Curated annotation (Swiss-Prot):
Organism annotation: Sus scrofa
Cofactor: heme
Keyword terms of this UniProt record: Endoplasmic reticulum, Heme, Iron, Membrane, Metal-binding, Monooxygenase, NADP, Oxidoreductase, Transmembrane, Transmembrane helix
GO biological process: lipid metabolic process
Molecular function terms, GO-annotated: heme binding; iron ion binding; long-chain fatty acid omega-hydroxylase activity
Function in brief: Catalyzes the omega- and (omega-1)-hydroxylation of various fatty acids such as laurate and palmitate. Has no activity toward taurochenodeoxycholic acid.
Keyword Magnesium applies: no
Protein name, per record: Cytochrome P450 4A24
Pfam families: p450
Superkingdom of source: Eukaryota
Subcellular localization(s) per the UniProt record: Endoplasmic reticulum membrane
PROSITE patterns referenced in this protein's UniProt entry, alphabetically: CYTOCHROME_P450
InterPro entries linked: Cyt_P450, Cyt_P450_CS, Cyt_P450_E_grp-I, Cyt_P450_sf, Cytochrome_P450_Monoox
Similarity comment: Belongs to the cytochrome P450 family.
């Protein structure tokens, strides 16, 4: 290479280096200004000292994130600032008055966190915002009409009995049992039969086991990614081991939902079947989506349809499985309440061969225990919002638009200012006529974006608890105490292990 050419190349390299340095300086200035804006915006909300780079993130890298959360709830009234890292901060909210103000508004969900779910569940009802969300919610609400939910009770009972039959065989060999896995298969079986017109049994289908494992992997990977500044970048994440594992798990989940959609489409194409469905006064969840797709053309794309199926396949089984598992653990840990529930159910159902819609409102003490367990172990431990306009709270503190709020349902349910002796299992908190704040108990979130399937979930929990207590006496396994951890839903790091004894 000639001297002039070398000089030219050297000059270009210097220019490129200067441009790169300039871009780095501009980015650093941008991050600095954003941090200063956050510091000013959050100055009314104290928090423990945070590191300038990694914020409070190390505080939440422990075996369980929940003890550090509860320390904050006790120390800082109503809300506190939480720094994930240097330029990522939010306000953690755990006060019912604050919750009421936030949930009365229409702020969107926090895009920074929820966008990480898109490769898994797409832009369905959980992730949509604004008018699109409103239209989709209105379209799907009829799928949860009480006339639709009534016959589901029988289907729920059949799925629960299949699970209990398996348990009876297992505990004949060993009374110790991990329950989250089989409960998840049972709730998947239930949602597929009720909402997706599935004729088989997810509890005996090998593909369903693969789907359940994929969901567990996806939840864990989502939790890992939300805590890592490095993995926020989509390109870096796709190239990382976690990203590749996430891609494989999402593919398995999508294959499962695609099979469900194609099977129902094939059934509807049989002669006369479509006409029979159209004559129904109320349609189930998947039929509403398929008819909207077939009859309204582009109003619901194939991508939209799959996103809703992915969303409800997950939400319709996993959150309920979490709820049922923790309820059974709570009752196992408090045998006096377990026995009182059993006596109530025996008086109502006798031999337990059948349970109907009408029975569900006739088990008040069992319902109180279910609600108290949901207070202690809310299936969805938190939701988040991104302020679209300034907000002022009842105590006069305020925040500007653009701030992220993390509404900690777990923190709210364990707030000693809201629930005296919050770690104590006390079903009398939910006795008929007992007074509490309208936003003190939110196992299904609240406001206009509350869980669309909350009545479905509550019915399934009652059916599962009632039939289980009629057949088994439950006790905790003291050698394997569960370690609660929030991963989209409230999981246990080491499963939920019980000891079961078949009742005579």
């Amino acid at each position: 290479m000639t001297v002039p050419a070398l000089a030219s190349a050297s000059g270009l390299l210097q220019v490129a280096s200067l441009l790169g340095l300039l871009l780095l300086l501009l980015k650093a200035a941008q991050l600095y200004l954003h941090r200063q804006w956050l510091l000013k915006a959050l100055q009314q909300f104290p928090s423990p000292p945070s590191h300038w780079l990694y914020g409070h993130s190390r505080e939440f890298q422990e075996e369980s994130e929940l003890p550090p959360l509860l320390k904050r709830v006790e120390k800082y009234p109503s809300a506190c600032a939480l720094w994930r890292w240097g330029t990522r901060a939010m306000v953690l909210v755990y006060d019912p008055d604050y919750m009421k103000v936030v949930l009365a508004r229409s702020d969107p969900k926090n895009s920074v966190v929820y966008r990480l779910l898109i490769p898994w569940i797409g832009c369905g009802l959980l992730l949509l915002n604004g008018q699109t969300w409103f239209q989709r919610r209105r379209m799907l609400t009829p799928a949860f009409h009480y006339d639709i939910l009534k016959p589901y009770v029988g289907l729920m009972a059949k799925s629960v009995q299949v699970m209990l039959d398996k348990w009876e065989q297992l505990v004949a060999q060993d009374p110790r049992l991990e329950i989250v896995g089989p409960v998840s298969l049972m709730t998947l079986d239930t949602i597929m039969k009720c909402a997706f017109s599935h004729q088989g049994s997810a509890q005996t289908d090998g593909d369903s086991h693969s789907y359940i494992q994929a969901i567990w992997d996806l939840k864990n990977l989502f939790s890992i990614r939300t805590k890592s500044a490095f993995l926020q970048n989509d390109i870096i994440y796709r190239l990382s081991p976690e990203g590749r594992k996430n891609h494989r798990a999402a593919r398995i989940a999508h294959q499962h939902t695609d099979r469900v959609i194609q099977l129902r489409k094939a059934q509807l194409q049989k002669q006369g079947e479509m006409e029979n469905v159209r004559k129904k006064r109320h349609l189930d969840f998947l039929d509403i989506l398929l008819l909207a797709r077939m009859e309204k053309g582009n109003s619901l794309s194939d991508t939209d349809l799959r996103a809703e199926v992915d969303t409800f396949m997950f939400e319709g089984h996993d959150t309920t499985a979490s709820g049922i598992s923790w309820i059974l653990y709570a009752l196992a840990s408090h045998p006096e309440h377990q026995q009182r529930c059993r006596e109530e159910i025996q008086g109502l159902l006798g031999d337990g061969t059948s349970i109907t819609w009408d029975h569900l409102d006739q088990m008040p003490y069992t319902t109180m225990c279910i609600k108290e367990a949901l207070r202690l172990y809310p299936p969805v431990p938190g939701v988040s919002r991104e302020l679209s306009k300034p907000i002022t709270f009842p105590d006069g503190r305020s925040l500007p638009a653009g701030i992220t709020l993390s509404l900690s349902i777990y923190g709210l349910h364990h707030n000693p200012q809201v629930w005296p002796n919050p770690e104590e299992f006390d079903p009398s908190r939910f006795a008929p006529g007992s007074a509490r704040h309208s936003h003190a108990f939110m196992p299904f979130s609240g406001g206009s974006r509350n869980c669309i399937g909350k009545q479905f979930a509550m019915n399934e929990m009652k059916v599962a608890v009632a039939l289980t207590l009629l057949r088994f006496e439950l006790a905790p396994d003291p050698s394997r105490k569960p370690i609660a951890t929030p991963e989209v839903v409230l999981n246990s790091k080491n499963g939920i292990h019980l000891k079961l004894r078949k009742l005579p």
